[in-house]
């Protein structure tokens, strides 16, 4: 439990962007998870268009070990029909450094990010895309209350998590 208690969330900015680039994700193809550059661009877009949400560089003892973006979703044509009825958040770019996977820290990062966004901006359903071949991520999201849909965008299945 000590490992999890020592994580720190820092808003992603251009000042700490190089930290996000140092996260070891060489074993994860870009078609599975967006790069730090893509997440920085999406973060900038969200800020410029006043979208609510957070993009975090996550640190453990000062070392960047994770990146996550959870923010107001801009509707896409490929969104599942369930999401057309109400505003929702979109989870993007979530990656944990290779050295820190499999110890529960990813779940802690995800849940704390969701709670922070809910606290700061209100509760909404969450949607994410997960590559059809990314079985490890699929199992992770199912364990964390997401439901797989039949809707796809390219090679990504949509997963949804509704508020209680």
Give each language-model segment a name.
Residues 6-99, 110-112, 116, 120, ...:
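Acetyl-CoA-dependent GNAT
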Residues 103, 120-124:
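Short coil/turn segments at alpha/beta junctions that flank glycine-rich nucleotide-binding fingerprints
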Residues 65, 103-105, 128:
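Short glycine-rich loop/turn motifs that provide flexible caps or phosphate-binding loops at active sites
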């Amino acid at each position: 439990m000590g490992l999890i208690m020592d994580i720190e969330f820092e808003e992603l900015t251009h000042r700490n962007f190089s930290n996000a680039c140092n996260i070891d994700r060489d074993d994860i193809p870009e078609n599975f998870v967006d790069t730090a550059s893509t997440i920085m661009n999406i973060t900038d877009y969200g800020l410029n268009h006043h979208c609510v949400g957070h993009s975090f560089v996550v640190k453990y003892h000062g070392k960047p070990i994770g990146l996550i973006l959870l923010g107001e979703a801009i509707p896409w044509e490929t969104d599942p029909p369930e999401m057309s009825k109400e505003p929702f958040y979109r989870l993007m770019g979530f990656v944990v450094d290779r050295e820190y996977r499999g110890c529960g820290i990813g779940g802690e990062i995800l849940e704390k990010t969701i709670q922070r966004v809910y606290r700061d901006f209100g509760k909404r359903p969450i949607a994410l895309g997960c590559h059809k071949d990314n079985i490890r991520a699929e199992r992770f999201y199912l364990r964390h209350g997401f439901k797989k849909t039949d809707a796809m965008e390219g090679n990504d299945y949509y997963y949804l998590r509704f508020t209680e």
